[in-house]
């Protein structure tokens, strides 16, 4: 279906999704409004919510696109970060797409990925229903460490790094999954499916919980409260990508984010966060008392405002368009 978000902006939702469940719709509306203030009226925007397997649906809905305008596509929702077809590139002047991978870059310049002509990384924004709260100093925050999220297979290494004494079957599960061996999925479901794990008592003044299933943890207001009151927030990989809303929302609240390696794209360059190659590094990081001297909520929040906020992302898109 096609929905008109603004006079010069249409949202195309693939058949496997629902418009009303678009988590960042208000943010996208504000983002387009800012772009309209910066660019002239000859720009037309298309926001596509779908997987790469839905690409033909996108093409069918844009067959009669007005080629006399500058047509810009913002492709969201494809966590696998696949590269569009040549037909899509021929139809749009610029394509900004979420979750683009390092491996698909044709080269790097000054540490930033360069993709094929007309293709640019698009940051994630934040979920509309997660409230933005005042940024507190570290001294005023109750929790040293916070994580509440789904325990998917990619997050098992994080689970094991947090658990003081993992069970043998959990270690075997991780070995099988890591080496893509038969039986790993079955053992994972046996050990973890439908279960909740609370490690809050393992670490002083912390709230650390794993649950089963997407979006089954804290409600958005509670989640925002924990972000506001936490010094360190863990941001593990989702089902396919290390980029996630949690990273943006935690940075917005001035938290020290510990994340797996993010793609080499402009919005993450020099981000004031901690990047781990392996979650085995986590225990040593958590006992580092110099963390709170290295980072500050104000520095983290400033980076968010400059690079990850709606205004920051709009400025990035504007700069990319003007550079061509």
Question: What residue spans do the PLM features occupy?
Answer:
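Nucleotide-sugar donor-binding catalytic core of glycosyltransferases
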Residues: 1-275, 306-321
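A charged, aromatic-enriched C-terminal amphipathic alpha-helix characteristic of glycosyltransferases
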Residues: 287-324
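Catalytic cores of eukaryotic secretory-pathway lumenal/extracellular enzymes that build
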Residues: 279-282
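A signal for specific C-terminal beta-sheet/loop modules enriched in small/flexible residues
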Residues: 110-111, 285, 289
């Amino acid at each position: 279906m096609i929905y008109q978000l603004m006079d010069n902006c249409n949202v195309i939702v693939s058949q496997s999704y629902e418009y009303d469940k678009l988590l960042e719709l208000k943010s996208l509306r504000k983002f387009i409004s800012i772009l309209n203030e910066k660019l002239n009226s000859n720009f037309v925007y298309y926001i596509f919510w779908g997987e790469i397997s839905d690409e033909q649906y996108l093409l069918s809905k844009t067959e009669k696109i007005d080629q006399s305008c500058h047509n810009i596509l913002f492709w969201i929702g494809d966590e696998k970060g696949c590269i569009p077809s040549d037909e899509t590139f021929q139809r749009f002047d610029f394509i900004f797409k979420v979750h683009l991978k390092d491996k698909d870059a044709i080269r790097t310049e000054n540490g930033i990925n360069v993709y094929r002509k007309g293709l640019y990384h698009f940051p994630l924004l934040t979920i509309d229903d997660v409230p933005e709260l005042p940024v507190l100093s570290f001294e005023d925050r109750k929790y040293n460490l916070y994580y509440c999220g789904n325990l998917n297979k990619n997050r098992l290494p994080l689970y094991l790094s947090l658990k003081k004494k993992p069970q043998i079957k959990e270690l075997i599960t991780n070995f099988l999954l890591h080496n893509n061996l038969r039986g790993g999925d079955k053992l994972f479901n046996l050990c973890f499916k439908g279960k909740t794990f609370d490690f809050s008592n393992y670490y002083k003044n912390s709230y650390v919980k794993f649950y089963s299933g997407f979006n089954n943890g804290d409600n958005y207001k509670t989640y925002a409260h924990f972000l506001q009151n936490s010094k360190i927030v863990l941001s593990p990989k989702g089902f396919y990508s290390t980029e996630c809303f949690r990273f943006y929302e935690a940075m917005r609240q001035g938290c020290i984010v510990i994340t797996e390696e993010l793609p080499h794209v402009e919005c993450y360059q020099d981000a004031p966060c901690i990047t781990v190659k392996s979650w085995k590094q986590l225990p040593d990081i958590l006992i580092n008392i110099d963390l709170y001297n290295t980072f500050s909520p104000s520095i983290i929040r400033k980076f968010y405002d400059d690079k990850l906020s709606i205004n920051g992302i709009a400025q990035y898109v504007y700069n990319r368009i003007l550079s061509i």
